[in-house]
A protein has these predicted regions:
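Ser/Thr-rich, Proline-interspersed low-complexity disordered segments
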Residues: 10-13, 17-50, 561, 565-566
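Flexible loop/hinge segments at secondary-structure junctions
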Residues: 47-254
Length: 566
């Protein structure tokens, strides 16, 4: 019974299913077989090559710092993804920057040996300096002249480091004093005459006297610098490729770059007349300059103060021609021979044969390509300063005739009065100097002053010359000085009250009038560094001859004794 009921139920369910819609077909199943990836090795980064640069820490601190700054900028700019450059403290580097003779020059640093200006000796031997440094201070007793005292060397830390690189470690000595840079000069002056200093060439100034070392004078353009023993040559050495890149990127630095130097030779009285002219006729027109020509032609600017006009009808010279003067135009050959560049016209004999002689004289100078100042075709021309730029140094010359006679007028040629309304009033010169100084010029001012036949200056002379320096002149020159006179030296500039005759030699009544000085002023990077004094005696009524060492020392002692040092 139970079985029959179950079968009936199952049959009913089947019949009910037959009445529904067609069934949804079952979708086909697609089977995709994926390949198993083959594992790839992780790439190893290629190391970037590194080149190292080492800067010697023993270099003077100022130079070391300058190099580090320049090289830091270089490594940043020159590094690439393919090569890095780094500065290192390890001397075991690809490139070493240090003192040496090999490699690419980066810095040439010249040291100067100097003493206070009123020092009589002109130089020393390098061997003496080496012995002094090694602990023998008596090796340089000659620097104190007749005192015979072992001197003290004053220098700052950078100069000490530089000398240590050149000479080795110094001996412990009270005669070697390392002081602050600003104290070197005042301490040397306080301890003169037994004191000297070593400092960078470009830090010289007028209160120092540059000393020669083994006869090498750094104030000479032609100085054999390769023979000078106190020059640091800092070079890059090592990997040639990197060294070449450094040399191309970092222009070499030189603190005695001749392209930045200007030498101006200032001279005393020229008057090609009387005994001097007689000797020129007898022995040749260039005879007076033959012994000192090199002092003049090696300057960048050679100054001549010619007090006399040329005239083609000038009477033949004689020893008794007196004080009315003219010169044969042929004598201009002497001025050519010494390399004249600038002619001063403050002299008081330009009109001796009439003002008409001056214009043709000026035309002669212009044909030679020479420039003039302190006089001119008229008042405006005479008062006009002469300006020029020499190797980047801005120079200005200004001069006036304080003493008198042949002053230029509005329509007459002549020498420049010191002021248009009053030839002895210096206010016009002072204002002009101030203006030129404000414009960046190194002003050289000259005065045709009252003539004195003694070494000392007068109170009025000291006052008037100092007024021009106080206005801004770095050099003040007494062009009137038939007799050589002393100096006034201060931080503001150099005054020479009288340089003496040069090509005017028959004033035989006075030894001082037979003495001449050529003041070779040195400018560097538009700054006045100081003066190189040349000394001579005029012989044979006409010819300056360089003094021997004893004669020169005697003259310097005389002049220093009557000079002012501030």
């Amino acid at each position: 019974m139970f079985v029959r009921r179950w079968l009936s139920l199952l049959l009913g369910m089947l019949l009910a299913g037959c009445g529904s819609a067609e069934p949804t077909p079952t979708p086909a199943i697609t089977i995709i077989f994926l390949a198993t990836p083959t594992p790839q090795p992780t790439p190893t980064p290629t190391p970037v090559p590194v080149k190292t640069i080492w800067v010697d820490p023993a270099l003077p601190a100022g130079l070391h710092q300058a190099l580090m700054q320049r090289l830091s900028a270089f490594v940043e700019q020159a590094s690439t993804p393919a090569r890095r450059l780094v500065l290192t403290e390890s001397p075991d580097a690809d490139v070493r920057v240090t003192v040496g003779r090999a490699g690419a020059p980066l810095i040439t640093h010249t040291l100067a040996v100097a003493a206070p200006f009123p020092t009589v000796p002109d130089g020393l031997a390098f061997e003496q300096l080496r012995r002094f440094w090694a602990g023998q201070p008596d090796a340089l007793t000659s620097l104190s002249d007749q005192a015979g005292i072992a001197p003290t060397l004053f220098l700052d830390g950078d100069a000490h480091a530089a000398l240590t690189l050149l000479l080795g470690q110094p001996a412990a000595s009270p005669n070697i004093q390392v002081v602050a840079p600003q104290d070197v000069l005042p301490l040397a002056w306080q301890n003169r005459p037994a004191a000297f200093a070593v400092l960078p060439f470009d830090r010289l100034e007028v209160r120092w006297k540059l000393l020669h070392v083994d006869g090498v004078n750094l104030f000479e353009r032609e100085a054999p610098i390769d023979a000078y023993p106190l020059t640091l040559s800092i070079r890059a050495q090592g990997d040639p490729e990197v060294v070449d890149e450094i040399a191309a990127a970092l222009p070499a630095m030189d603190n005695r770059d001749l392209s930045k130097m200007a030498i101006v030779a200032m001279t005393g009285v020229t008057a090609l007349v009387r005994g001097t002219a007689v000797r020129m006729e007898q022995k040749g027109i260039t005879y007076p300059a033959e012994k000192i020509r090199d002092w003049l032609v090696t300057a960048d600017v050679t100054h001549i103060s010619n007090e006399v006009s040329f005239w083609d009808k000038c009477p033949p010279p004689s020893f008794s021609s007196g004080v009315v003067m003219c010169s044969d135009p042929r004598y201009i050959e002497l001025l050519r021979y010494v390399g004249t560049d600038v002619v001063e016209l403050t002299g008081n004999h330009l009109w001796d044969y009439g003002y008409q002689r001056l214009i043709p004289t000026l035309e002669m100078y212009e044909r030679e390509g020479w420039r003039y100042f302190g006089g001119g075709r008229d008042l405006a021309d005479a008062l006009r300063p002469l300006t020029m730029t020499v190797n980047g140094n801005r120079l200005a010359f200004i001069g006036c005739n304080w003493f008198g006679a042949n002053w230029a007028k509005e329509n007459l040629p002549g020498s420049a009065p010191c002021s248009p309304g009053d030839p002895r009033d210096l206010s016009y010169q002072v204002e002009t100097i101030r203006r030129l100084r404000a414009e960046g010029y190194n002003v050289i001012a000259t005065l045709q002053y009252e003539e004195y036949y003694f070494y000392e200056s007068t109170l009025r002379q000291r006052r008037d010359f100092a007024a021009l320096r106080e206005a801004g002149a770095v050099v003040v020159n007494g062009s009137q000085g038939h007799h050589v006179q002393g100096f006034d030296i201060s931080a503001e500039g150099f005054i020479h009250w009288g340089t003496g005759n040069i090509f005017f030699g028959d004033q035989t009544f006075s030894k001082g009038a037979q003495t001449t000085m050529v003041d070779r002023h040195v400018f560097y990077d538009n700054r006045y560094l100081g003066v190189d004094l040349r000394t001579a005696f005029i012989q044979d009524l006409s010819q300056p001859v360089p003094m021997n060492p004893d004669e020169r020392a005697a003259l310097l002692r005389t002049l220093f004794n009557v000079s002012l040092f501030r």
